[in-house]
Amino acid sequence: MSIEEELKGHFRNNYHKGLINLTYTTKLLSYEFYQALKKHGIAEQQYNVLRILRGFRSEAPLSIGFIKERMLDKDSDVSRIVDRLNEKGLLTRKENSEDRRQKSVEITEKGLSLLDSMFDCERKIDTLLNNLSEEEIHELNTLLDKIRRKTDNKQEN
């Protein structure tokens, strides 16, 4: 179904249509992912922190700043997210011995087990895009990178 049919409307031009289409599709995909995460009692930002900790496990422990730089949502309150995950026993948060102002964060075995059990969530997300060929996915990623570079340039000015 086209975006016009989906929203029952028209657009000023193709740029407007592209922006609305991108936003609408992103919200649909995020909702699907949210539903999958909800079954595991974890929010998207919490999942993102755990994913970062797992991915950089060889460099552990990590600082809050290191995690924040890699978050999908750059406005996330990483300290609060880390506190909640610490309360659930999914990570540890300790004072950094070299700099007491810094906190050192590391994923626990319980956190790793949770991520392992969430493999179905990750597979579900992969299937949301499997109607695209490898070439189309590559093109999509190239176009999204190009759009993001434009927004990065505006933030630098």
Placement of each model-derived feature along the sequence:
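Pre-recognition alpha-helix immediately N-terminal to the DNA-recognition helix
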Residues: 21, 48-52, 113
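Short, locally clustered residues in the helix-turn-helix/winged-helix DNA-binding domain
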Residues: 23, 51-58, 119, 145
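C-terminal regulatory/oligomerization modules of transcriptional regulators
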Residues: 1-10, 135-157
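Charged, amphipathic alpha-helical coiled-coil/dimerization segments
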Residues: 5, 83-138
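N-terminal leader segment of winged-helix/HTH proteins
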Residues: 1-40, 88-90
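Short, hydrophobic-biased segments on the C-terminal half of alpha helices
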Residues: 64, 82-83
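N-terminal helix-turn-helix DNA-binding core of bacterial DNA-binding proteins
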Residues: 31-74
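The N-cap/first-turn positions of alpha helices
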Residues: 26, 43-49, 111, 136
